[in-house]
From Swiss-Prot:
It is found in: Membrane. Disulfide bonds: none annotated. The record marks Q174 as: Transition state stabilizer. The gene is PME11. Its EC number is 3.1.1.11. This is Putative pectinesterase 11.
Length: 352
């Protein structure tokens, strides 16, 4: 999404969230059929229909998109679906359509379950994984766009409300994560890129995430798009870790009222002393909301920070320090603890 180009050698950091999916999946499956239609308030969030994806042919499907296509439209929000992706490298472009909410896509470990594609230039068409459905959850999966340094190459686009990501690795170079619109939550994720690698107009909370910059000189971690002072969108980074090579800004404004806050986060010396960039438009210095609160590390020194960024007071920071920022208490849900087999018409006919 950025205007400047960088040419450093791309490398994927040796960082993985080694979190093994609960083995109770195998022992909790029942043979119950799909529940009848019901209102959202009557969903049993403890139980999901389980669909297995396994390249070896031992699952219900061998490709992730096939598993998604097997799920019927679910606009009455009556059923949770849990797609369990066995370890492997899945080379495909995946889309979750709007008419299929309440899907969880889960790898086994982010270190051995990969969704990879290579596409670039078009920010809306290049994503390896695109989410259009609400109430989506992704766990323990590595999502990569391997297009390289030549232009925009989105690994993940989130264009729906109420999406959560846990223990995921998301990597590309430019525009890695298009955090497009809606309320979103990212926890214990690793996100890597060089230019505007977290961008978009969503309202998102990033908690205990590791952000790694590949930019050799003056890249930007964020490019948040907020077009008015009354718009509720913005990015909050809470308890995060910023590392990398070269130098990077914390953010620059895609929209005139761009809003980004870093709190309780570690900044390595990869963060440029100025901290923030106005993207060649000094008028935005009067309208953006760029704040830091109790951050630490060599890159957190504010002595040379641009004067139009904020060192937030306790009172100013409060609104950004909890899940209330994204209304998360109303929609974030725990992982299901019980599973049902998919109906026969949903399963791959080749599987006995």
């Amino acid at each position: 999404m950025g205007l400047y180009k960088t040419k450093s050698k791309r490398s994927i950091a040796n960082y993985h969230h080694i979190i093994i999916i609960n083995i109770f999946i195998l022992s909790s499956i029942t043979s119950s059929s799909m529940a009848s239609s019901s209102s959202p308030s009557s969903i049993d969030f403890s139980t999901a229909i389980l669909i297995r994806v396994d390249q070896s042919g031992k699952g219900d499907f061998s490709k992730i998109q096939e598993a998604i296509e097997s799920i019927p439209p679910n606009l009455n929000n009556s059923q949770l679906y849990f797609i369990w992706v066995k370890p492997g490298i899945y080379r495909e472009k995946v889309v979750i359509p709007a008419e299929k909410p309440y899907i969880t896509l889960s790898g086994t470990q982010a270190s051995n379950t990969f969704l990879i594609w290579s596409d670039g230039e078009d920010i809306l068409e290049s994503p390896t994984l695109t989410i259009f459905a609400s109430d989506f959850v992704c766990r323990f999966l590595t999502i990569q766009n391997k297009f390289g340094t030549a232009g925009r190459a989105v690994a993940l686009r989130v264009a729906a409300d109420k999406a959560a990501f846990y223990g995921c690795v998301i990597t590309s170079y430019q525009d890695t994560l298009l955090d497009d619109n809606g309320n979103h939550y990212f926890k214990n994720c690793y996100i890597e890129g060089a230019t505007d690698f977290i961008c978009g107009s969503a309202s998102s909370l990033y908690e205990r995430c590791h952000l790694h910059s590949l930019s050799p000189n003056n890249g930007s971690i964020t490019a948040q798009m907020r077009t008015s002072a009354t718009e509720k969108s913005g990015f909050t980074f809470l308890g995060c870790k910023l590392t990398g090579s070269g130098s990077t800004f914390l953010g620059r404004p895609w929209g005139a009222y761009s809003r980004v806050v870093f709190a309780y986060s570690f900044f390595s010396n990869v963060v440029a002393p100025q901290g923030w960039n106005q993207w060649g438009d000094s008028t935005k210095e009067n309208t953006v909301y760029y704040g830091e609160y109790k951050c630490y590390g060599p890159g957190a020194d504010r002595e040379q920070r641009v004067e139009w960024s904020k060192q937030l007071s306790d009172e100013e920071a409060t609104v950004f320090l909890s899940k209330d920022f994204i209304g998360g208490k109303d929609w974030l849900r725990p992982a299901p603890s019980h599973f049902k087999n998919a109906p026969k018409q949903t399963q791959n006919k080749e599987i006995n």
